[in-house]
Amino acid sequence: MNRKKRSDRNHIIYEIVNTINGKSYIGITAAIGRRFHYSAKLRLQKHFSRARRENKDWALYIDMRENDESVYDLFIVDVVRGKALAHQIEVELIKEFNYELNSTH
């Protein structure tokens, strides 16, 4: 029997800021239990890994290939219940603020 996918899981809205050029990225990731900062840090590490391994022309990955990992700061913007709500807030934040490293910008 297939398990029903959970819709009530906590999701983290996070911001990555390049401290050299001031450019930033907003994203979401699923929380691992209540370890919010740890979950966001894992997602940041995955971004770094993909930026090195994949030849994506996404603004964030281009920026990461041009800079050392140490120039990036990670901030938790919010923790919300449910993926749909997290996506909705992410889209609203991207529209409202100048997140230069989001490829949708």
What are the residue ranges of the model-derived segments?
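Structure-specific nucleic-acid interaction/processing domains
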Residues: 1-105
